[in-house]
Amino acid sequence: LIVKMLMRRVKFFRTEWFRKREAAIFMLGAAILFVIVIGIARNASSTSHFFTMAAGLLIEFALLLIAVLTSLLIRHSSKQINYGMRIYTPIMLMGLLVITFRIIFIPNSLIALVFPPLLVVFGFWQWASIHRNGPKVPKSDNSYAIASFVVTAITFAISIVGYSLLGLQVYIWWIFQLTVLQLIVACDDLLKQYRHKRVDILVRAYRLKHQNDVGKDKGSFILVTWLYDLVEMVLIPVLYLLSIPFCLYMASEVFDLTEICMDMFFYPFFNYEY
């Protein structure tokens, strides 16, 4: 009711930009509202350990969904946004099922029975989604969707040989990894927009002001591009690298395996004595 009233009275909600992104924006708003409501309920009933655990996992998933939707809204045009949502739907729904397995403490024997068929169903869905929507989204999203299909196939292979819990861990790690990659790519896209709108203008102004002192190489404009170059060449690659251990830790936290994860991080694999 509130949304309908806003759409009638606020001009922004009647613009073409909003209408073509309406589904993604509504989903984003619903996810944010869900996080707020569940967060308040979690703090209000802190005596129930089960509810606290379940609410925490659901909030984590909602935050992942918020990150993916935000990235799509930043990077995709009005013609691409719906296709982008469809191409990520299978992997996110399967991730919700995996988190549900953790919340309800489904027995290991039942996981071994149910998980592989679910992977087959969602794997075919992912492949069909890539085939239908892949050509209509940016290449990076198509690549991530293909990687999601490959991870699904690897998880199925792990599960079918009897390591279903390891398969769950691998799958939930990829969902965290995919989400962080989406955020980094979105930041990189915003950085490129900043370059076109601001840095290129500064470079042209600097070139006109110092015509006799500036060469043709890129390093000649370091005084005006140093911050952009620092973020683009150093910070973004470092974020990609650090995202791997971070996502491994977050995935291990879902299944209370953080102690094992930290032991692996700090294990002296190369311990040479002179």
What are these regions (language model features)?
Residues L1-Y274:
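Hydrophobic/aromatic interaction determinants used to assemble and anchor large protein complexes
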